[in-house]
Curated annotation (Swiss-Prot):
It is an enzyme of class 2 (transferase). It is found in: Endoplasmic reticulum membrane. This is GPI mannosyltransferase 3. The keyword Endoplasmic reticulum applies. The keyword Transcription does not apply.
Length: 561
């Protein structure tokens, strides 16, 4: 097959993922890229604490901001294009990295098959995540790595990787040592003229960009390591056991490909002289997992740069096995791998956690068209776990919005709880303490929440009508910060009988549906928790006292000031 046809096939799959993948994965896809770019370009948006503290580099958001600026100049900056175009560009980069993987592996058929079918790469390959960019750059760098020559071209994408994601150095340190050990060039000269020079150029440019946009001299890779590694801030968002990457993380990312990967590991260990590249890749994979395992906070996406390394090991082993395997075995193996990847790719890309993505066009319409009695625009309150949805980048209207924040304990206060934790501990108290009642027009015009919360704040919602119910997930999971682990420990240590209710409280943070409520205007019928076609009985307005009669802890505090 001609290389151009190979690239076009890969490109078609990656571009298809842009439009097939319509589910929510992690907040960083929006809050650390699109949201930042939107604020840079259009002057409004939300910057999370990471940008205030300077632990994120502006390099990636600036690339997206460049796209936004072009769209704005052409007067094509519709919300739809602001969402789709960055994903298309990321898909193009992912497609090129996949093509380079095919070339790197010797243009083997198994390589093309294995780079196209992984469920996790289909699921994340077009998302605007720094981890996706890192995985693409890692693959490109590996394809230029001097496995059998003296090229140092790989140092450029590798250096960019390490600047944007300092943890990438864990991958490139053993590979760089391997390069230096095998090189026939003078080692000191190679280090000074290539490694140090390229590193300084990339770091210098990155520091200059970040210093300008952060407004002060700053080295974001150092700040990243200081907060996430040395201060262990990441553990606030969840901790996992040391073996998680080995027992859960990498096997989940590989999915059904774990089976041929194990086969590849066994073949490489038994016949390491036949698999010199796979041997070095396995050493790199193992060392990377060991180092990452030392950090308490772990996520699937953190091992996505290891995916091309694992796929190479699989390709190497299956290509040699294919020489002696029967045609039936070959087709059966390929079919099992294909089906085993298509199923999770389809479910996670189209069904699970689709609510936030389907929600945003509805909020966009509200932001564009809604006006209250005083002709004021919408103001929207998200009573959900923090960053449960995209934000201004998907609405592209400068309306007032508010969500529950979840900054970590940067000041190391005792008994610290973020705003989201405080809200879900006692939603009614939080509402009474933070939302003004007089006049009723001071209430948020719209409230967005997951369905289990509605019953807990039913009195508050009597001033609203149900506008939209959006299906979110067939299966919900526990949400929350490190406080969940702390509460588990306390409950178990005290042999508390309330563990079940404690977990139920956490479970109620998310739900199967997302509900959008709209504030009642004067003279409108009070139809609490009832959709247009729901058929639910309307509660008697005398069952509860009017909300304006409730006593507030802080009546004068305005949520949207």
């Amino acid at each position: 097959m001609k290389l151009i046809y190979v690239f076009l096939l890969i490109l078609a799959v990656r571009l298809a993922s842009v439009f097939v993948v319509q589910t929510y994965y992690v907040p960083d896809e929006y809050w650390q890229s699109l949201e930042v770019a939107h604020k840079l370009t259009f002057g409004y948006g939300y910057l999370t604490w990471e940008w205030v503290q300077g632990i994120r580099s502006y390099v990636y958001p600036l690339l997206i901001a460049g796209l936004y600026k072009i769209l704005a100049l052409l007067q094509l900056d519709s919300a739809h294009l602001l969402v789709v175009l960055p994903r298309i560009v990321q898909a193009l980069l992912s497609a090129y990295s996949d093509y380079r993987f095919f070339v790197w592996t010797g243009k083997r058929k198994w390589a093309l098959f294995l780079i196209l079918v992984p469920w996790f790469w289909f699921y994340t390959g077009s998302r605007t995540l720094a981890n996706t960019l890192e995985a693409s750059l890692t693959t490109i760098a590996l394809s230029y790595f001097p496995w059998y020559g003296e090229s140092t071209a790989y140092l450029w994408p590798a250096a960019i990787c390490c600047f944007l994601r300092p943890t990438a150095a864990v991958i490139w340190l053993p590979l760089s040592l391997y390069h230096l050990r095998r090189s026939r060039q003078n080692v000191l000269e190679l280090i000074l003229k290539r490694f140090v020079l390229i590193g300084l150029l990339v770091a210098g440019l990155g520091i200059a960009i970040d210093t300008y946009w952060h407004g002060q001299l700053i080295v974001t890779p150092y700040e990243f390591l200081k907060y996430n590694i040395f201060n262990n801030i990441g553990s606030f968002y969840g901790s996992h056991p040391w073996h998680w990457y080995f027992s859960v993380g990498l096997p989940t990312v590989l999915g059904i490909n774990t089976l041929p990967f194990i086969f590849g590991v066994m073949e490489t260990v038994k016949k390491s002289e036949k698999y010199p590249v796979s041997k070095q890749l396995l050493i790199t994979i193992f060392l990377t997992l060991v180092v990452l395992s030392a950090v308490e906070h772990k996520e699937f996406r953190f091992v996505s740069p290891l995916l091309p390394l694992c796929l190479y090991v699989i390709t190497d082993a299956l290509s040699r096995w294919s020489i002696r395997a029967s045609s039936t075995m070959l087709w059966t193996t390929a079919l099992v791998i294909l089906v085993g990847n298509v199923m999770p790719a389809w479910y996670l890309s189209t069904v699970h956690q689709k609510g936030p993505i389907e929600l945003m066009p509805k909020l966009r319409e509200i932001a564009r068209e809604y006006r209250d009695e005083r002709e004021h625009q919408a103001n929207i309150l998200f009573l959900m776990p923090c960053h449960s949805t995209p934000y201004y980048s998907h609405i592209h209207q400068n309306v007032t919005m508010r969500f529950l924040t979840c900054e970590p304990n940067l000041e190391k206060k005792e008994q610290y709880k973020d705003e989201a934790d405080r809200f879900f501990e006692d939603p009614v108290h939080w509402i009474n303490s933070h939302i003004p009642m007089h006049p009723l027009t001071a209430l948020p015009t719209h409230v967005v929440l997951f369905d289990p919360l509605a019953e807990n704040i039913s009195v508050f919602l009597r001033n609203y009508r149900l506008l939209h119910r959006i299906e979110h997930a067939e299966v919900t999971r526990l949400e929350g910060s490190q406080a969940l682990v702390d509460q588990w420990s306390e409950a178990l240590g005290a042999q508390s009988p309330n563990l079940a209710s404690l977990l139920q409280n956490r479970q109620s943070r998310t739900g199967r549906s997302i509900l959008v409520y709209q504030r009642l205007k004067k003279g409108e019928e009070n139809a609490f928790n009832r959709g247009p076609d729901s058929g639910q009985h309307e509660p008697d307005v005398h069952d509860h006292p009017p909300l304006e009669d409730l006593v507030l802890a802080n009546e004068n505090e305005n949520l949207f000031n």
